[in-house]
Amino acid sequence: MSHALDERRTRSVRVGRINIGGAAPVVVQSMCATKTRAIDATVAQCEQLRAAGAGVVRIAIDNEKDVTAVKEIRRQTSATLSVDLQENYRLAGSVAPYVDKIRYNPGHLHHIEREKSVPDKVGWLASVARDNDVALRIGVNCGSVAPDFLARYPGDQLEALVESALWHCQLMEDFGFDRFVVSLKDSDPEKVLQANRRFAAARPDVPIHLGVTEAGLPPQGVIKTRIAFEKLLATGIGDTIRASLTLPNERKHEEVLAALAILDDVRNGRFISVPDFGQGLNIISCPSCSRVENDAFVQLAEQVRDLTDYAKQHRLTIAVMGCRVNGPGETDDADLGLWCGPSTVVLKKKDQKVGSFSYAEVLPRLRTELDRLIAAGR
């Protein structure tokens, strides 16, 4: 199921057998939560998500072993495949022949080959995409905005986010490549609204992928997603969407159903009143995906939600992140952050590390730190 919301007409971008933007209906995306090298499980989840209504299924790759797995996954699934390059943009060259779209994060390009300029790296990505007949997504994220843009716009992360996306669009076009879409994500739905409105006003021609990153557990995560999606889709902003929910593997398809339900409601003029999440405790958690380094992450997020229920009237943010990609940067702005590794959880207060604890030990310490913040009047 998909729906045409054509108040804003972007250019059409072909992704495999489907089109994004232009006159095409809005496409729902999702992301596999299985380990990419677990080929049978990943193929099964690709098919599960496709059957639920996902027009594009994304897989994370971290190294050449993952690329080898994607080659076999491609052979076994009919899903339209996108890959997330994470921190190693060079993997694009070896994975491109087997996928339909590649997502790169502008804020991660500086991690390797620091002697090369960002324009050189973007030019290489454009040539790889062109040579292999694949589309690109420029995926800008609140927790990993490129350092030079943060320095250029001190105190205004939102403007840094938007300007980074605009610059990368211009770079792509300077290299003669325009088969790309853009995403501007934040865990705060109001910031998602502002960022996407600013970008759409500046580049009405570029297709936009919408997402509230780390929306968290349902039902709160669905509500946060609705806050942004209803207002943006109703004005024609958004060509593809994803509801990024924290869910166990066997329920991963529920984020597809949630996104489809929002689309259906907007199409039929049904808008649901939503609460203001700025007035009380806000728990954000990243969507379960193949980057998660311990499957206990989802259970921990649920335990954090239950443990902190007593503090729901306090205006605090607690972030629960499942991997090293999202963990460091996207817990920095939270009052309390939990960055989950393979065997330990790093507990943080803003950008300061409190300590590393086992999954069993971290909850009592979280309660202690939360009580201290409440007592201090935060």
Feature locations, PLM:
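N-terminal amphipathic alpha-helix/helix-capping segment at the start of soluble metabolic enzymes
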Residues: 1-31, 130-132
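Catalytic alpha/beta core domains of metabolic enzymes, predominantly
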Residues: 141-144, 149-309, 320
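Hydrophobic faces of well-ordered beta-strands that scaffold small-molecule active sites
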Residues: 26-32, 55-59, 79-85, 102-104, ...
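Glycine-rich phosphate-binding active-site loops on the catalytic face of alpha/beta enzymes
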Residues: 55, 98-115, 235-252, 340-353
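Glycine-enriched alpha-helix->loop->beta-strand junction motifs that scaffold or abut catalytic
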Residues: 76-79, 96-102, 130-132, 200-206, ...
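Beta-strand/loop-dominated core regions that host nucleotide or nucleotide-derived cofactor-binding catalytic loops
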Residues: 342-348, 352-375
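Active-site beta->alpha loop and helix N-cap motifs at the rims of alpha/beta catalytic domains
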Residues: 50, 54-168, 172-173, 189
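Short, acidic/polar
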Residues: 37-48, 87-93, 225-229
